[in-house]
């Protein structure tokens, strides 16, 4: 019900969007920090829970043969696009509007994601990944992370680079990777301790947490 | 420092020391030599099964090197195994799997204690001597047998030279040599085999171990080395009669990286083969029956019959009819009972009596009992004895822990009540909690460097995200930290081939350029403000450089020509007299000159400060201290001090702009993190094996003082930690409003909580498999950190400097 009210109310207030006080008292959750004006935010709703990630992680941990990261990434791509189209985009509010899916931007943000793998890989190496060895695997990890952040990248592009609000989505993926590193030094010698499998799972869990709860923060 | 803090610190140190004294007791050993106990007269009259023994110890000979298809290239041994003239075993070698404790096990049959592993490092120590301990070597010697020994000089350290009629030791110090260590041994063989004027011939080959250390278990040098050893075995086999027993064994195994010391399957599974022409006329061991060698891969390197390495001792003693050494835990290897004929039962009962006496158990009169049940009982006793090889002094353990918990509670109270709630104190508490809990996991102790890295990236990431205005400094800091991480391998699990240190070793010209740059940058720091002091620093830096190149020349490393000209020029200037000096003779006077010059500069500066109080005293002395630390660092690690300089300036920048309110508190916490991280990335680990002794003898002549060497060793291994500790104090003096004692509470909190949890972990895990290979070394390192960094640097040196600074 609320979802329908907001677009209706928006039309009245759109000319006042410069007026912070009005738009804040009107529609925004009280304690939400403002990111640019008009504000961009993700509604607090169960709609953003990434169920596909739960299934995918389960499949990756239990049923993928030998933890095939490549295959997992291939599977992840359509899931993420669908997630963006059906769940994340409808929940994202741009200056009090909910925008329709922009198919051109979908492709552009896909390319952006692939380009982002290079700086992402650089960051992963800076944060301690092996250098010169296993670069292919590190690249695969950064590709996976970038695909995981695809909805957020799309939204950043869609909102004229208002990184401020979507920063936490990227951070939650990074924190997921970081926490999962704890599994690496253990001397259990399990196949899943191989680089970069723990980090892939960590990134998925981080993304899961991020897409579910970041709108609440 | 205030009285309260000093008191707490002393109590903390005392508690840890008390604990350590209870934890590392000298093992009780039975004195005296064994005599036959059971039917002594009959036994004395027995004929031994063999007349002569040839023992070939091949260092780090893992079981699969001897037996496994595609791995082993001991073709002749395989042939003998198939003919039944050789009996193969996999011998479990009790950790710590390093040579000295293992040799003790092989000769005396006793389980090693942890002190032996430490003494393995201390080359010149003589307290591990087995002169007064019963072993089959001493039994042979007492029975008038002639023993000849060639190989690793650890044997000569263990046994008095009069045991060996002839000996030639090779030093295992230069691990990079694969060939000469072994040809040095083999060259004696033709003479020995021709004259046969010995009863026992012991050969200890080191080459295989060296190959493992250098290139891992699958190194390309392994197959030729196997063939070389195989040829040695064939040579001996061909020239001895069938009254000679040839035994080939590894003292321990190795893991796939080629290291050893721990308790993994690879490290503890050593190969053992008994070879004699006579053996083919006896039934071969059941596990070897119908098996064709080389055999296929087995899980955990378990090939053929599995025995304990110490079982070698009673077996040899029985076969050669000598009394079983008193402290032996070994159980006679059942397969050999057929060689003893009708006396087998006698010998096993003898072994039973000896073992029960060691276990201080009453022995029921065993006469014609069933051999199998007796052997089974002996195995049980052996297992119990091996587990309780060390007797902990529980009173001292609990006194230490109790005292430390009181101290920790007091420190925690003082710290928490005085700390303001800010990022620095939260970080400190988080680090303390994390490190404290990590000591309960053996892999986290082994891979502690990963935890510190994990913490530092979290801190940088957090700080970057919350203070985006300092992005360039954060990036610089991160790049430097990553360089530091890539400089050396640490821990046990991951060994990367392309570390910066390895690259620099293979490109000496770049290395020496970087060393020059480092020394110049460090020495000329603050040149514009105090040119005179900088020139003095430069002088010290120059001396340091000359010494380092000179050292490289002596040790066969490559140094560039400009450095060599510099050395010649400097030396003709310094040590006038015109006669050309040998580089080797120069080392000691050069190092002494360096230390004298630095001491003089420090004294001058202190005297100057006593007259004209200058606030910048500490930051002005800092470069000179850094040069001293550089002096004690291996040359491939020296450029890291350049990295540190950059890191320090970017860190100061971040703290100045991003954390103006808690600048010094933050620096103290980060200093603690960086101390540990850089200690590990200099190549240190929590294992005894990586203690670096190369810089411990700088300026030390032959009749040296052990305490000076110890101090130099500590500084050499802890140089980066001292650097960061001093760096924090420099900033403290310049910018802090708090007193040093108050500031110090945070690291006291860390050390006391960390120590307490480690002591608790040691008590909980005292019967854990890894107690000697992981937890005990960690306890030693904790002592080292406590004494050197926490006490000497941060409680003696730094307050003194602060006092002079006024």
Curated annotation (Swiss-Prot), chain A:
The keyword Endoplasmic reticulum applies. It comes from Eremothecium gossypii (strain ATCC 10895 / CBS 109.51 / FGSC 9923 / NRRL Y-1056) (Yeast). InterPro entries: GPI_biosynthesis_protein_Pig-F. The chain crosses the membrane at residues 45-61, 74-94, 111-131, 138-158, 169-189, 195-215. It is found in: Endoplasmic reticulum membrane. One of its GO terms (cellular component) is endoplasmic reticulum membrane. Acts in the GPI biosynthetic pathway between GlcNAc-PI synthesis and GPI transfer to protein. Keywords: Endoplasmic reticulum, GPI-anchor biosynthesis, Membrane, Transmembrane, Transmembrane helix. Pathway: Glycolipid biosynthesis; glycosylphosphatidylinositol-anchor biosynthesis. It is a multi-pass membrane protein. GO terms for biological process: GPI anchor biosynthetic process. One of its GO terms (molecular function) is mannose-ethanolamine phosphotransferase activity. Belongs to the PIGF family. This is Glycosylphosphatidylinositol anchor biosynthesis protein 11.
Swiss-Prot record, chain B:
Ethanolamine phosphate transferase involved in glycosylphosphatidylinositol-anchor biosynthesis. Transfers ethanolamine phosphate to the GPI second mannose. Its EC number is 2.-.-.-. It is a multi-pass membrane protein. Belongs to the PIGG/PIGN/PIGO family. PIGG subfamily. The chain crosses the membrane at residues 396-416, 425-445, 451-471, 508-528, 532-552, 593-613, 624-644, 664-684, 706-726, 745-765, 782-804. It comes from the Eukaryota. It comes from Eremothecium gossypii (strain ATCC 10895 / CBS 109.51 / FGSC 9923 / NRRL Y-1056) (Yeast). The keyword Thylakoid does not apply. Keywords: Endoplasmic reticulum, Glycoprotein, GPI-anchor biosynthesis, Membrane, Transferase, Transmembrane, Transmembrane helix. Glycans are attached at residues 70, 184, 242, 488. Pathway: Glycolipid biosynthesis; glycosylphosphatidylinositol-anchor biosynthesis. One of its GO terms (biological process) is GPI anchor biosynthetic process. This is GPI ethanolamine phosphate transferase 2. GO terms for molecular function: CP2 mannose-ethanolamine phosphotransferase activity. It is found in: Endoplasmic reticulum membrane. GO terms for cellular component: endoplasmic reticulum membrane; plasma membrane.
